[in-house]
Amino acid sequence: MPTVHLIIKGRVQGVFFRATAKDVADETGVVGWVKNTKEGHVEIMASGKEEALQKFIAWCKIGPQKAIVNDVATRRVEEKKFKNFQIVRG
């Protein structure tokens, strides 16, 4: 399945971005992980069917209600295998 690496910038920490991203990933069938970065961004590695990935990326450009997304850097990467979508902490 195609895999993408995302860096989401803006007011994206402390607004339930990771938890909501997991919900959206689970709903769309996307697998991978999401984590906060030291720089204050959110980083995501996601795999799924092309249509599901596009829906997930579109959601990432908006985020949860309290988020203010300024930029989503998206790049295709070598296919990765994940069993589910996880929130990575720390």
For the regions a language model picked out, list residue spans one by one.
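Intrinsically disordered, low-complexity, mixed-charge
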Residues: 1-90
